[in-house]
């Protein structure tokens, strides 16, 4: 019995090594899972569910194949693929989760999320996030011709890259108070998230209870998977050699 959690793969046609590692994982290990959770930023950038490129279709197909074997797949939108929507879910069979969701893992209650909303000191990003998550703006964007959307996203990507180079690393990490607030709000002792690219397992005390926060790793130089069983959990790496 195993449940897998992954995030921050940043899949893109330019990184075939990441894609190959992901596809191998999906066609092998994932087949044995009780469930697979993707906690955001599966894609480097998802322009919209109307992306019918060969690359996008290959990723869709791997989810279709896995779901058809009976393995449930859950998807949380990240800051780079927040436009993954109901059409993608219907096409692939994945189940879209709320921005912050409470789940049961082998009898243990946990809160799962991408993690960007925990970085409360990054005021500039949170303001940008609030704008692009407005339903009316997404409604308009989704109706723009795809080739125009690609140009818009290319400009946004460039601006994001420039902005990150001038930011302090500290403000791009979570704030402990927000972590505790979310865990208290959802009445859990376990949180799982990605986003920060700082894989680790943190234990701390709050409200006279021991809490655990698991941070998923990114896939920039190697794959990263949280393997959760009824008895234990462990962050594991996967080399880009495709050997599992």
Swiss-Prot record:
Residue intervals passing through the bilayer: none
Protein's pathway: Glycolipid biosynthesis; lipid IV(A) biosynthesis; lipid IV(A) from (3R)-3-hydroxytetradecanoyl-[acyl-carrier-protein] and UDP-N-acetyl-alpha-D-glucosamine: step 4/6
Catalytic activity annotation: UDP-2-N,3-O-bis[(3R)-3-hydroxytetradecanoyl]-alpha-D-glucosamine + H2O = 2-N,3-O-bis[(3R)-3-hydroxytetradecanoyl]-alpha-D-glucosaminyl 1-phosphate + UMP + 2 H(+)
Keyword Signal: no
EC number: 3.6.1.54
UniProt-annotated binding residues for Mn(2+) 1: 8, 10, 41, 197
Keywords, sorted A to Z: Cell inner membrane, Cell membrane, Hydrolase, Lipid A biosynthesis, Lipid biosynthesis, Lipid metabolism, Manganese, Membrane, Metal-binding
Binding site for Mn(2+) 2: 41, 79, 114, 195
Family annotation (Gene3D superfamilies): 3.60.21.10
Localization (cell): Cell inner membrane
Needed co-factor(s): Mn(2+)
Gene Ontology CC entries for this record: cytoplasm; extrinsic component of plasma membrane
InterPro entries: Calcineurin-like_PHP_ApaH, LpxH-like, Metallo-depent_PP-like, UDP-diacylglucosamine_Hdrlase
Keyword Metal-binding applies: yes
SUPFAM superfamilies reported for this sequence: Metallo-dependent phosphatases
Molecular function in Gene Ontology: manganese ion binding; UDP-2,3-diacylglucosamine hydrolase activity
Xref: Pfam families: Metallophos (PF00149)
Residues holding substrate: 79-80, 122, 164, 167, 195
Bound cofactor: record note: Binds 2 Mn(2+) ions per subunit in a binuclear metal center.
Summary of the function given for this chain in its UniProt record: Hydrolyzes the pyrophosphate bond of UDP-2,3-diacylglucosamine to yield 2,3-diacylglucosamine 1-phosphate (lipid X) and UMP by catalyzing the attack of water at the alpha-P atom. Involved in the biosynthesis of lipid A, a phosphorylated glycolipid that anchors the lipopolysaccharide to the outer membrane of the cell.
Family of the protein in this entry: Belongs to the LpxH family.
Name of the protein in its database record: UDP-2,3-diacylglucosamine hydrolase
